[in-house]
Amino acid sequence: MAPLLGRKPYPLVKPLSEPPGPGEEVYTIEHTKEAFRNKEEYEARLRRYGERIWTCKSTGSSQLTHKEAWEEEQEVTELLQEEYPVWFEKPVLEIVHHNTVPLDKLVDQVWVEILTKYAVGEKCDLMVGNDKTLSVEVVKIHPLENPPEENAEKKMEGACDSPSSDKENASQENLKKEPQSKEEESRRESLSDRARRSPRKLPTTMKEEKKKWVMPKFLPHKYDVKLVNEDKVISDVPADNLFRTERPPNKEIMRYFIRHYALRLGSGESAPWVVEDELVKKFSLPSKFSDFLLDPHKFLAENPSTKRKSLSSPEGKPRKRLKNVETGTGGEGAKGDKKKNKDSQNIPLSPTIWSHMQVKKVNGSPLKMKNSGTSKKSDEENVLGTPKSSKKQGDKKSSDPKRRRKSGLNKTPNSQRLSKKEDKSLGGAKKPRMKQMTLLDLAKSPAAAGSPKKQRRSSTTGSAKLGKPFPPMALHLLRFYKENKGKEDKKTTLSSLLSKAAKALSPEDRSRLPEELKELVQKRWELLEQKRRWALMSEEEKQSVLKQKRQEVKQKLREKAKERREKEMQVRREMSRRYEDQELEGKNLPAFRLFDMPEGLPNTIFGDVAMVVEFLHCYSGLLMPDDQYPITSIALLEALAGEKAGFLYLNRVLVVLLQTLLQDELAEGYSELDMPLSEIPLTMHSVSELVRLCLRPSDAHEEESARGSDDWQSGADFDDMVSSEFLEKLETAEVFELDPQEKVSLLLALCHRILMTYSVEDHVEAVHQKSAEMWKERVATLKEANDRKRAEKQKRKEQMETKTDGDVLIKAEKKKESTVKKETPKVLPKEEPEPEDMISTVKSRRLMSIQAKKEKEEQERLNKVRMEKEAEEERIRRQKAATEKAFQDAVTKAKLVLRRTPLGTDRNHNRYWLFSDVVPGLYIEKGWVHESIDYSFTLPPEEEPVLTEEEEEEEEVKKEEETEDGEKEDEGSIISASNDISQQGAPSHESSIETTVPKQGQNLWFVCDTPKDFDELLESLHPQGVRESELKIRLQINYQEILHSIHLTKKGNPGLKTCDGHQELLKFLRSDIIEVASRLQKGGLGYLEDTSEFEEFEERVKTLEKLPEFGECVIALQESVIKKFLQGFMAPKQKKKKKTGGEESTTAEEVDDQKKLAEEARVATAVEKWKTAVREAQTFSRMHVLLGMLDACIKWDMSAENARCKVCRRKGEDDKLILCDECNKAFHLFCLRPALYRIPAGEWLCPACQPTIARRSSRGRNYKEDSEEEEDSEEEDEEESEEEDSEEEHRNTGHSLRSRKKVKTSSKSKMQKKPAKPASRSASKTDTNPSKTSPKSSAKPKSRAAPSSPVDIDELVRQSSKPPSRKKDVELQKCEEILQKIMKFRHSWPFREPVSAEEAEDYQDVITSPMDLTTMQGKFKSSEYHSASDFIEDMKLIFSNAEEYNQPSSNVLTCMSRTEEAFVELLQKSLPGVSYLRRRTRKRAATPSDNSDDDDDDEEEDERSKKQKNGKQGKKASSKRKVEHSRTEKYQTKQK
């Protein structure tokens, strides 16, 4: 198998006879695997293979390269292996081998052959009985007993014995045959069509329908078949009992098969097909060359007298007349006798013999007579008889093997009686011209049909009317052109004849030729004349002629281009004209499906739901930064429709919205019972009441007066969406109990309220700023690339100029050398051949090896350079792709935070919407115009100045340019999405074309959710409509996005989790009350000290069902809290304690009794209001909110669970921890100086709280100063006697109650609800039974546990220095591993080393406790960490310091957040039992606090507030920037 060169296969190079040596290089062609030792032969063969001169043998495709033709043949080979059954190979190749018919007829012939006969080896089904089949294989085909062709032949010969009725019989047979021919033709066409698309088994119903195509019946052969599963042979099985199991190949596969395995030798019509030798031997195909002696041309050449007699027969046998073209008349002659006499030489060529020679069946395959092709066809068309039936009959003969002999014998048309030799004799004018009879002559003399008639000369177009005869060359050209006009394989011969005629004929002879031929000959003569003149020209003349021709060609191209541009401009002008859509006629818009809403929801609210979901998606970076599950429209619709299924999902949406709203400055004035709403815990169970409190109109009015800005006036109208009646309804009902319409209006009101917050404004500004930065980077990158291209172009231009100058010099030198060489060869002496000895051979080999080595090194160097260049290009490409992706993302985000606008409107003013992926599909909105929308357009002016054509063209060109600029601006601008509704249509110059307005009606939403509907919509939109043209452009631009969105609609929506809202609220209210009580009891903050009392309280809460019962329980819980541990509006007003001792101190101002009474009354009133609200609560969410207020008013940071040693800052070892009875600070016994050996009896005061007189001056730490610094900002008042009494009473239970300080409400007082850990604290519960407590024991101070015996100080020190337990060792090892990983984390670079004074001058002033990762490593080495909690506290300190010192937009904070995320992830993997919770630093001005906390965060906050008051903000900001810059530089230097 190899591609053809011309018409012959091109042989491949034989493989190498010997394998190559170790150092020998072999050149191999990739696709053919041909190997060459000679590089020149290899390159020559490659060049040959690269030319487009090859033809694919299997498909016939020409003008291919060798590789393309080779690959096509490989594809055809694979196709035939898959599609062509092996049992059809032999019967088809037997027909093809040595056949001479064209390919199309050959394909028809073999295709019908395999359709009407089973092949040997074919597997089929044998029908046994009515319903049983057996799988069999054909092993033998029996020949037909009585072939129908022979019977038909005998019958037709018997019908045509009478010589007198020759003509009549022929005409009758033609009339009878014509309908049969048409029927056969239609049957054959349907058969070939059915073969391509029929299944493997035909349905039985096809036999009954006469009008439909039916598979041709199998010939009545009998077959011997062999059972597949058994070794048995069944003989003489009729064809009707066999059924094919595999469909035979179609005509196209058959065509590929014949081309692939056979080749036609020669270009003539009788050229035989020859099968490959291997297949001839494999299938033993018979040769048919002996039958080629029956060629009719050879027969006529051996019988010249027959030919002459047939032309001028005096016996009176009429001949067929040629058709007169000018008059349109024709004639025909009578037939001669049909008897065959092979011995006589004077018998004319009868139609029977002619048909035998024209269609001869040799070994089952017909042979086509070698003739001139078109001459026969033209003669057939010129005969007056039945040309259509003749044509169809001829086709039928060549394609239907069953009826070939029958039709060939007796149904030969009249057109076949005129031979080609006669035609040539008439055309050549060498014989005396015969008169041709017409039908009129025959009609006048019917009796003389057998006698010779007087012949008349017929006028033909090919003969000249002048007396001077044509030269032989002209006659030969005329005859050849007439016979072979339009034939592809005769073009070369015709071209050579034209050239000869152009040279031989004179101008007069050329002018006498027919018009078509005269034009061809004249062109060829002009071409030859031009070549002759070109050969006589000098070089200068040739250059001038070429230059002139080039100019002419350029001028023609310019003119054509100008005409094309004018036509395109005209088309563009016409297409750019816009008309009112409803005035245009076009396709109807497709009918879209109404969007399916869940049961109970009207279709009109879909727009509002889509707005809410789209708002949540567009602002997901602000509203849901860490949420992995987006809120979709389908899920939200289901949540709105169902109560049980929608409780969790709807409340989640409300929590997301309120989280942003309550944290904004806009909501600072939102409060309830003098407590800001932001301080109340926001959960799924309290959100319903918090929504009501946020949407109260009073808050909006207060905020309006507070802001005093005009933009609030426009937003205040959104409060009208939630009426007062609706808010009153929310007081008695939960959100999930509302109607769907009310739920949607609630969500809309929240969205509009959030849109007016400062957070949204900052978010939009940040997104746009990022987009602008990306745009600047993109512009800079493009500019840099353009500059680089410009520089490369300039450099290339300079190199070209240098190269041109060099080429001129080289040419001049070469010219000189050539002239010298021409002169010197005669003078040069004869060179003697150098002797070929061993030394010269070795030397030449060494030189060749050195040269090869150099070439190899050069090649390696070039490969290395090329690979480096490719790697650099790949890196640049990836970088560009990443930059482009980042830019597109930034632009997309910037567009998302703006107002979503529709894609456009159609002729009926329906709007088309494409949302994000959370609202999949393309939506159509009808009835969107209502009374509040002012839709208007400007009518065109009535009178316009009349413009000339040129002015009109200029005006249109300007308009087009303006339109294009406007479109570019609209696409490129981000803010263009926020245009007004009236500007959504066409550009401004086209807006005046509109003459219709949208009609008001019901707002309905339709959806386009299939690609077919979308494509139909695109086709139906009119491109010249003022609205639909813009809509079509937008749809085409977003085509892929719309298809993606349509595809998302097919995905199933997971159902929502069902949940009973009432039971959920009830369950969590019980758990929250129990949790608060548990924390009070474990932290020693309330009176629920007895375990049995707490368990009784817990059991009582679990049985509660009604809200009033829960209210009484919550009130009882509030009353059980020790008053000194209350804060906020529940905190009692305390007296400031007087300082004692000899030190000078400023005396606090005495509080006026009236002010004190007023303050007490205010507190009592606030608490009473809260209790009243608890008793009157009508919803569980309201009760959750009021319980959250109580939780926020408890000082949880004063709980005993949070006790931490003031000296070492560590928790743990509770039995060695003692609490001060004055300030509630904790100390380890062994951390005090001097250390304590045992828990002292009675009250114990820490060194900071001891009186000054009782203390001696110490060189150690100044605890008094520490305490004073902590208490500078506190306001203390003396407590009332009642409080002291309660304090005394509570002391009997084992507690030492001290005067606590009131802490102003802040975010630190709000604790997240979580189950309290059980703590074995004996300091707060030395004895749970008060009756058994002695006065001595009650006088003991607070301690973790009273030791049973006195403890020696050495023992305490030994215990303190004792190594930690094994579990703590494992935890610390894991902590050290975490630290090592954090050190290697790429974003931790700002925290690896301490901040020096050079980097930030004021860092030590702002940050009181600096910490870094290197210092922590040092702590691990020196074993300063005793537990994982110490390590976590230092990590918190690093992050808190970074938050406090750096500005919000700095890179350090970004690195901090990523480092903290990585740390939390590592901590959860390594230490899953250790929790991590860090309080975020509030960026608010700190207010004086009444209480000093143990935690370092409070001290740092006080320090920050003091520094801010001292006016160091500016210095701090500059230092932040400075440290950030210096740290970034350091990091970049290390990276490099």
Swiss-Prot record:
Residues 344-355 have a biased composition (Polar residues). Residues 1366-1470 form the Bromo domain. The modification Phosphoserine is found at residue 1349. Its EC number is 2.7.10.2. The bromo domain mediates the specific interaction with acetylated histones. Atypical tyrosine-protein kinase that plays a central role in chromatin remodeling and acts as a transcription regulator. Involved in DNA damage response by phosphorylating 'Tyr-142' of histone H2AX (H2AXY142ph). H2AXY142ph plays a central role in DNA repair and acts as a mark that distinguishes between apoptotic and repair responses to genotoxic stress. Essential component of the WICH complex, a chromatin remodeling complex that mobilizes nucleosomes and reconfigures irregular chromatin to a regular nucleosomal array structure. Residues 515-583, 768-803, 850-890, 1261-1293 form a coiled coil. Interacts with smarca5/snf2h; the interaction is direct and forms the WICH complex. Component of the B-WICH complex. InterPro entries: BAZ1B, BAZ1B_Bromo, BAZ1B_PHD, Bromodomain, Bromodomain-like_sf, DDT_dom, WHIM1_dom, WHIM2_dom. Residues 144-207, 304-470, 557-579, 785-839, 940-973, 1256-1371, 1477-1536 are annotated as: Disordered. One of its GO terms (molecular function) is histone kinase activity. It is found in: Nucleus. This is Tyrosine-protein kinase BAZ1B. Its main location: nucleus. It catalyses: L-tyrosyl-[protein] + ATP = O-phospho-L-tyrosyl-[protein] + ADP + H(+). Residues 443-452, 1325-1350 have a biased composition (Low complexity). Residues 1297-1316, 1506-1524 have a biased composition (Basic residues). PANTHER family: TYROSINE-PROTEIN KINASE BAZ1B. GO terms for biological process: chromatin remodeling; DNA damage response; post-translational protein modification. Residues 151-196, 334-343, 392-401, 785-832, 1525-1536 have a biased composition (Basic and acidic residues). Residues 603-667 form the DDT domain. Residues 25-130 form the WAC domain. Keywords: ATP-binding, Bromodomain, Coiled coil, DNA damage, Kinase, Metal-binding, Nucleotide-binding, Nucleus, Phosphoprotein, Transcription, Transcription regulation, Transferase, Tyrosine-protein kinase, Zinc, Zinc-finger. Its cofactor is Mn(2+).
